[in-house]
């Protein structure tokens, strides 16, 4: 622990900065800024050390290892001991100030590796485990990585990469019991570091963090081509941690369920660092196929996800209800509960206990990010007594941009701006839609080795231009209509936002996913709006007495498209429909890769 170390002048200035953020939180008079118990932190090292002091015996991580029947609990005290041990060993092996990659499945080993690097060793480079060997090799070279801490699954991949590169990589296996083939064991390094600490080695534990220096390089999973390396510092992350729990109550007894990849800043900041800041616990999912099983074992209270996960879970609930022949009964129960809620009586806990037991029985909050979600799904989950909120963020904002307050959620909105951060729209069109811009301590330092790209998105007044289009209502709630680069402009200068149409199509139960684009045909005076649609074949088969033909499917889909066209101006109407039978191309964040789909169509 370093709580008794006298702060340097720089550290004292950092503490004044942190106290300033807390003061702005306390001064915020917006009704939905309800929770004002944030403690000032100067950096992530300061955060985990103070959390270990405050919550020492509380559980930090729940993890189930291969072959185990139950989850293992790791306390905050054990966590800090492991972090200090690993950090001390890494410095002893000559890695201070180096770039160190972390890659693997979500686990406490991933978390401890990340913390050991960022809290005094060097610069952490979280890598996407879904990338190919060639892509990983390219990123290792770009980031000038000296060491890779990885799960056993990726050991051989990086052994090959190391052999192909001019410089050798120090490799550390999360789960190896001992060093073999020149690959270090994480547990052995932790023990080595603990022994060095007992002998008086203090270089890691007494390291003073420069909160303004680059500490993280996060490579974005671009939907338009080459990824960019987002440079973050400790202030970016600390600012997010201090402001994010102000519109959302997080308790020390909460258990977060970690299923999204930790290399994504959404999960890393909100599902990993933020729970540790608030003294909560994190339960690691063993993989997507184990979600339901692990939910019942961990019995979490909070769950971060993306639309695809929430929509699949919600769809599964209703499919099970229909199979049991209880659809009418459940709908009556939902109607009854909605009525009693109006007089302050929430019966969901009693009425839907059997349904919510699928999630472990204690889940109180689900937060959706990464892309727009159907508000009907959020409301539908809420009907069962689980509050479902939508948020908004970007890697470039560490990632917090906006979040719906738990006391005043708006399912159609991405949320409100956090205390101390700023949100605005610029270059508004005749419909009042403009580009969303964000300013605050959460905004990145810039793109790694890309000064021109950085200058294109961060203006001279330090506003980050997100590239997202939308508007902000009179109550401060923000809404997204699409991406600036994806706007379809008709010959008359009218704007069509494909994401907006895709979102409207997603509201149909018969549509699994869609891709909207423009097409110009010979002899046509203007562009046509085209929708490529992948239907929900299971539901369509349930609706029809015989196996549906392509024409049957298109008839159903056109009925859904016509519902949208009836309320849309002529220039925004979908004129052509393409039946899609396979999934669309996605990146590792599960987002549609538009340029790949456009090339397919061409």
Describe the predicted segments one by one.
Residues 515-520, 559-602:
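Conserved C-terminal "lid"/linker of ANL adenylate-forming enzymes
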């Amino acid at each position: 622990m370093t709580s008794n170390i006298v702060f340097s002048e720089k550290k004292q200035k950092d503490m004044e900065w942190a106290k300033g953020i807390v003061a702005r939180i306390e001064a915020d008079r917006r009704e939905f800024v309800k929770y004002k118990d944030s403690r000032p932190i100067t950096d992530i090292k300061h955060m985990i050390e103070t959390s270990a002091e405050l919550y020492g015996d509380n559980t930090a991580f729940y993890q189930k290892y291969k072959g185990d029947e139950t989850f293992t609990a790791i306390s905050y005290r054990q966590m800090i001991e492991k972090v200090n041990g690993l950090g001390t060993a890494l410095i002893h092996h000559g890695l201070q100030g180096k770039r160190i990659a972390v890659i693997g499945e979500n686990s406490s080993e991933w978390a401890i590796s990340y913390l050991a690097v960022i809290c005094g060793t060097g610069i952490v480079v979280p890598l996407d485990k879904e990338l190919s060997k060639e892509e990983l090799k390219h990123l290792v070279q770009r980031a000038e990585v000296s060491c890779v801490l990885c799960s056993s699954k990726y050991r051989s991949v990086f052994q090959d990469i190391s052999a192909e590169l001019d410089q050798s990589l120090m490799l550390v296996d999360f789960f190896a019991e001992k060093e073999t083939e020149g690959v270090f064991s994480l547990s052995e390094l932790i023990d080595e570091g603990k022994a060095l600490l007992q002998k008086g080695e203090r270089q890691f534990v007494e390291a003073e963090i420069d909160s303004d220096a680059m500490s993280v390089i996060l490579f974005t999973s671009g939907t338009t081509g080459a990824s960019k390396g987002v440079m973050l510092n400790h202030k970016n992350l600390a600012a997010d941690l201090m402001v994010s729990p102000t519109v959302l109550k997080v308790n020390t007894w909460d258990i977060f369920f970690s299923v999204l990849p930790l290399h994504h800043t959404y999960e890393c900041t909100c599902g990993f660092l933020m729970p540790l800041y608030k003294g909560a616990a994190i339960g690691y999912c063993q993989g997507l196929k184990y979600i339901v099983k692990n939910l019942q074992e961990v019995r979490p209270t909070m769950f971060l996800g993306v639309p695809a996960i929430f929509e699949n879970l919600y769809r599964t609930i209703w499919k099970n209800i229909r199979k049991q022949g209880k659809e009418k009964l459940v709908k009556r129960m939902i109607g009854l509960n909605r009525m009693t809620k109006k007089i302050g009586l929430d019966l969901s806990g009693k009425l839907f206990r059997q349904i919510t037991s699928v999630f472990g029985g204690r889940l109180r909050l689900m937060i959706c990010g990464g892309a727009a979600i159907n508000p009907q799904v959020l409301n539908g989950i809420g009907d069962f007594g689980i509050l479902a909120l939508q948020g908004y963020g970007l890697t470039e904002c560490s990632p917090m941009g906006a979040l719906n307050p738990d006391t005043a959620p708006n399912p159609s909105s991405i949320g409100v701006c956090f205390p101390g951060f700023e949100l605005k729209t610029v270059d508004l069109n005749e419909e009042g839609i403009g580009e969303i811009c964000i300013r605050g301590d959460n905004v990145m330092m810039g793109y790694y080795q890309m000064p021109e790209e950085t200058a294109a998105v961060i203006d001279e007044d330090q506003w980050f231009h997100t590239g997202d289009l939308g508007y902000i209502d009179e109550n401060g709630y923000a809404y997204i209509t699409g991406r600036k680069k994806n706007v379809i402009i008709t010959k008359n200068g009218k704007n069509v936002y494909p994401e907006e149409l895709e979102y409207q199509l997603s509201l149909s139960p018969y549509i699994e996913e869609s891709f909207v684009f423009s097409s110009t045909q010979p002899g046509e005076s203007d562009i046509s709006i085209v929708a490529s649609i992948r239907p929900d074949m299971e539901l369509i088969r349930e609706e029809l007495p015989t196996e549906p033909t392509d024409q049957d499917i298109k008839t159903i889909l056109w009925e859904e498209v016509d519902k949208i066209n009836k309320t849309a101006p002529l220039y925004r109407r979908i004129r052509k429909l393409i039946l899609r039978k396979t999934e669309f191309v996605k990146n590792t964040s599960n987002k549609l890769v538009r340029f790949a789909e456009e090339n397919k169509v061409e």
